[in-house]
C-alpha cells in the first residue's frame, strides 16, 4: 500500500509518500520560520495563506521524487487536528479534494499520533507496548501505548507545554524566534552557577506537567541577575536542566506505574540533546531502552502523517467526503487498529 501524507497543522507544510513494503519514498518540507520571525511567533492567518501557496508545488515535488504516479497511490492521509484551524483546513481541503478527484480513500490523522508513531519510521523501531513522552510546542503528555489506537493518557500539561515554556523563556532572554532551539544552544555554553530552579509538580504524586511557574521563576531570576552573555547562558542551562529533570522524573514514574521498559520520546522537544542524553542514561540504569525519531522527524513533517494514515487505511478505516478540521482532539478517543 502506498499513501500520500499531508501535514499543515501549524507553520510547516510537510508532504511525503510512504509505502508499506518499500518504506519512505520521499518527503518534502517547507518551514515558515522566516515568515513568522518578525512577529516573534506564529501568526495563524499568515500560516494558512503560506500553506495555500506551498502545498500543491510540494505535492508535485514529493510525487516526482518518489517516482509515483496518481495510479500508484492507494490512499491519502492529512492532518485533521489538533492544530490551528485555518492551517488544518488547508491540508484537509486539498487532501479531500485530491481523494475525490483521484477516487482514492482518505483519512484525517491525529497530529500527535503521527508524532507518537514517528520512531517507527526508523530501522530500529520500538515494539508495543511502551510509554510515550510527547513533547512539543503545544503538548506535553505521557501515554501508555499498547498498540495503534490503544492509548491511555497518563499525564499531560495543565498549562504551558514544555516547548511553549522553552519558546516563552527564550523570548524573555531576548532570543530570536524560534526560541527553543536557540535557548538550548545558549544553555550548552552555560556553567553550573548554583541556581535552585524548581522541578514543578515532582513533589507530589501524579504524572501531569506544569511549566508556567518555572517560566515565572526564570523571569524573576533574569531580572535579578547581571545582563551579560555568560550569566544568561548559566540561567538558560539551569532552566533547561529543570525542564529535562522534570520530564525524566515523570517518565520514570510512568514506567514504574505501567511496568514497561520501553520509552518513546517524540515531538519537537525530543530533538533536545540534554533530554535525549538524560533519558538514555535513565533507561540504561533501569535496564530499558529509549527510542526517538531522527532529528528531521522530531518536528512536524508529512512522513509521520503518511505512516500513521497508512496504518488506519490498511485496516479499512476511512472518512466521508466532508472537509473537517479538529483544533482540539483528545488522543485517547481514537479507535484502535485491529
UniProtKB/Swiss-Prot annotation:
Gene symbol here is tsaD
Q: Where does Fe cation bind?
A: 111, 115, 300
Q: How is the cofactor bound?
A: Binds 1 Fe(2+) ion per subunit.
List the keywords (alphabetical).
Answer: Acyltransferase, Cytoplasm, Iron, Metal-binding, Transferase, tRNA processing
Please state what the protein is called: tRNA N6-adenosine threonylcarbamoyltransferase
Q: Which residues bind substrate?
A: 134-138, 167, 180, 272
Q: Gene3D superfamilies under this entry?
A: 3.30.420.40
Which PANTHER family does the record match to this protein? TRNA N6-ADENOSINE THREONYLCARBAMOYLTRANSFERASE, TRNA N6-ADENOSINE THREONYLCARBAMOYLTRANSFERASE, MITOCHONDRIAL
Q: What is its EC number?
A: 2.3.1.234
Q: GO:BP terms for this protein?
A: tRNA threonylcarbamoyladenosine modification
Q: Which cofactors must be present for this protein to function?
A: Fe(2+)
- Catalytic function, reaction form: L-threonylcarbamoyladenylate + adenosine(37) in tRNA = N(6)-L-threonylcarbamoyladenosine(37) in tRNA + AMP + H(+)
In its UniProt record, a GO molecular function of this protein is: N(6)-L-threonylcarbamoyladenine synthase activity
The family note in this entry says: Belongs to the KAE1 / TsaD family.
Amino acid at each position: 500500500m502506498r499513501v500520500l501524507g499531508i501535514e499543515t497543522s501549524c507553520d510547516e507544510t510537510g508532504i511525503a509518500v510512504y509505502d508499506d513494503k518499500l518504506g519512505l519514498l520521499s518527503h518534502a518540507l517547507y518551514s515558515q520560520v522566516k515568515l513568522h520571525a518578525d512577529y516573534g511567533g506564529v501568526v495563524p492567518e499568515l500560516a494558512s495563506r503560506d500553506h495555500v501557496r506551498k502545498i500543491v508545488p510540494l505535492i508535485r515535488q514529493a510525487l516526482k521524487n518518489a517516482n509515483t504516479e496518481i495510479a500508484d497511490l492507494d490512499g491519502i492521509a492529512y492532518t485533521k487536528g489538533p492544530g490551528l484551524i485555518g492551517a488544518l483546513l488547508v491540508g484537509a481541503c486539498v487532501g479531500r479534494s485530491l481523494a475525490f478527484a483521484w477516487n482514492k480513500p482518505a483519512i484525517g490523522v491525529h497530529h500527535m499520533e503521527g508524532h507518537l508513531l514517528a520512531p517507527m519510521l526508523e530501522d530500529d523501531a520500538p515494539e508495543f507496548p511502551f510509554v510515550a513522552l510527547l513533547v512539543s510546542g503545544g503538548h506535553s503528555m505521557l501515554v501508555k501505548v499498547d498498540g495503534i489506537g490503544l492509548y491511555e493518557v497518563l499525564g499531560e500539561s495543565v498549562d504551558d507545554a514544555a516547548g511553549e515554556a522553552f519558546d516563552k523563556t527564550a523570548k524573555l532572554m531576548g532570543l530570536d524566534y524560534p526560541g527553543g532551539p536557540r535557548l538550548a544552544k545558549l544553555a550548552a555554553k552555560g556553567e553550573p552557577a548554583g541556581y535552585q530552579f524548581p522541578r514543578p509538580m515532582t513533589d507530589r504524586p501524579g504524572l501531569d506537567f506544569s511549566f508556567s511557574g518555572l517560566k515565572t521563576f526564570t523571569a524573576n531570576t533574569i531580572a535579578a541577575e547581571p545582563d551579560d552573555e555568560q550569566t544568561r547562558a548559566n540561567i538558560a542551562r539551569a532552566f533547561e536542566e529543570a525542564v529535562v529533570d522534570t520530564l525524566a522524573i515523570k517518565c520514570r514514574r510512568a514506567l514504574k506505574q505501567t511496568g514497561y521498559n520501553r520509552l518513546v520520546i517524540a515531538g519537537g522537544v525530543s530533538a533536545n540533546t540534554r533530554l535525549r542524553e538524560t533519558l538514555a542514561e535513565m533507561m540504561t540504569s533501569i535496564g530499558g531502552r529509549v527510542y526517538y525519531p531522527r532529528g528531521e522527524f522530531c518536528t512536524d513533517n508529512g512522513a509521520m502523517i503518511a505512516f500513521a494514515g497508512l496504518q488506519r487505511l490498511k485496516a479499512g478505516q476511512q472518512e466521508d467526503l466532508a472537509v473537517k478540521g479538529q483544533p482540539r482532539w483528545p488522543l485517547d478517543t481514537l479507535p484502535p487498529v485491529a
